[in-house]
Structures are given as structure tokens and as C-alpha cells.
């Protein structure tokens, strides 16, 4: 019986080792049904309105308007090789900056191209400032974790996260913008 168990285990291992890479060449699915993941870049743009339709923070003192772009990565190491492949929409955001490192933040992503064209995702949460002196003093690095509260028909909920650079003094060498990952769950594909 032990010999049969070992033979069966070896057969399963062989199928996994040899069929796994072959099956992966077609690529794994992009997610479960009803799951939509977007990865894109935002860059502050004075030509885009910085006033979201709704801002839930009385006394908000941060307003940002940005263009949204798809990105291209190197498949071998996932390094970003093009931060602005195609314009995919715009964003308007507001926040409430105080002396605390946690900034309440609200954003409306208006997508106008691709599968999600004509759809606006709305997200709210907070951004955590982690540095205000890299790559130089006056530039803030932050990460945002936001709950996506509005989306397309059949929208159930989601999350939007960012790696963000804020350059309020408009210092040379860094623009205000973010790399975003947005995951939305819907009742439909």
C-alpha cells in the first residue's frame, strides 16, 4: 500500500511540475467572476477640476485634480517602464490636512476609456504620510487605503490603495501623483 501511495504522490507531483508551467503559459485568470482589478497612475493636472462632486470633510483644505493613465510593466521583474501608456480618465479629490500624519481622503475616479469607460468609482478613507524628506525636504510620501463606496451597476464594494507623492511646494524633481490599485466586486462580470 505504501508503494502505491508513493507512486500516486509522484504521479501528482509530476503532473504539477510539468503541466503547471504549460498551463500557466496561457496565464492565470485575472480574478474570480465579479472581481475587477485596475492598476493605473494618477498625476496632478491643473487642467482637471480639483473639486469633486461631493466632499465629505467640512473644512477640507486639500483639493487635487489629476489625469489617470494606464501603465506598462516589464513582465520579467514588474518594473514600471511606461507610466502613461493611455489616458483612461480623470480624478478629483479632497482631503483634510492637519498636524496628524493621517489625512482623511476622498476621491472620484471618472474612467472614460476601456471596459470601465463611462464609470465613476468613489472611494473614501485615509492616507498615511510616511516621510516628508525623501527624495528631499518638502516632498511627502504617503500610502492611501480607501473603501470604494460607489461603482458600476451591480457594484458590491471594494478597496483602492495607493503609493503617493505629494509635492505641495512644487519642488523640482517630483510631481504630485500616485500609483493606484483598485479592486471592485460586482454581481456581474
Residue map of PLM features:
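Short, low-complexity disordered leader/linker segments with a strong preference
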Residues: 2, 16, 26-27
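Bacterial N-terminal signal peptides
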Residues: 8-19
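Sec/Tat signal peptide C-region and signal peptidase I cleavage site
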Residues: 20-24
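Beta-strand-enriched cores of mature, soluble protein domains
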Residues: 25-189
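Bacterial N-terminal signal peptides that target proteins for export
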Residues: 1-9
